[in-house]
């Protein structure tokens, strides 16, 4: 019984240690009005991870490996915003807010 308990403890703590990364959180608003923007995609370039802002414009990206990253927003009708040199540390939450401006998208005639 003790052997099984030890093995479970090692597996549990081992997976926590190896899975730990940092977090990125923030809020996305419309620049002119200051209103939150729901559904904005925030991507960590080169990592294949990201999140969408919620109904309050808030987002959180978890399990980000430590390092320096570029974040990019994507939302129809709004200009893309890029933030470079965002530092993420293990066990810490890096804060980054975005203010998006509307962009006219012209279609073909």
Language model segments and positions:
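Cleavable N-terminal targeting peptides that direct proteins into the secretory/outer-membrane pathway or into
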Residues: 1-21
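Periplasm-facing N-terminal accessory domains of Gram-negative outer-membrane beta-barrel systems
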Residues: 18-108
